[in-house]
Amino acid sequence: MKKMFLTGVLALAVAIAMPALAAAPKAPADGLKMDKTKQPVVFNHSTHKAVKCGDCHHPVNGKEDYQKCATAGCHDNMDKKDKSAKGYYHAMHDKGTKFKSCVGCHLETAGADAAKKKELTGCKGSKCHS
């Protein structure tokens, strides 16, 4: 009877833990070079660990599959003037999209702090474009 009870408790614990364990894949190593624009960015997932994966990696065909930004069919148009959802530059720099761009999130993070704003959103000498 005790074995059956313990087996049931263990099975329940595993069933409850599985969604949490499968929720997000392991983030890639730091030093991810995003070089699709004139001024490359070295992106570190560890710096952004407080941000949920889905805040940047939006659903594609109803699924969160955490692809790279410039994956074919996503933000794969490298024309800086392309302001559509396909535009890579636009996806990183737009301030008013449903899914926050890098710049949109950094502006929100900086708030009214002018020095922080320059540090997080400046084109030259920022933490992004060094």
Curated annotation (Swiss-Prot):
Signal sequence, renumbered to the chain: 1-23
One Pfam annotation reads: Cytochrom_CIII
Q: Where, in this chain's numbering, is heme c 1 bound? A: 45, 53, 56-57
Instruction: Tell me a Gene Ontology molecular-function term this record carries.
Output: electron transfer activity
Chain residues that bind heme c 4: 93, 123, 128-129
Chief subcellular location equals periplasm
Report if keyword Electron transport is assigned. yes
Note the superkingdom of the native organism: Bacteria
Write out the residues that bind heme c 3.
48, 102, 105-106
Its function, per the record, reads: Participates in sulfate respiration coupled with phosphorylation by transferring electrons from the enzyme dehydrogenase to ferredoxin.
Also noted in the record is: The second and fourth heme binding sites have unusual CXXXXCH motifs.
Tell me the protein's name. Cytochrome c3
Q: Which organism is it from?
A: Nitratidesulfovibrio vulgaris (strain DSM 19637 / Miyazaki F)
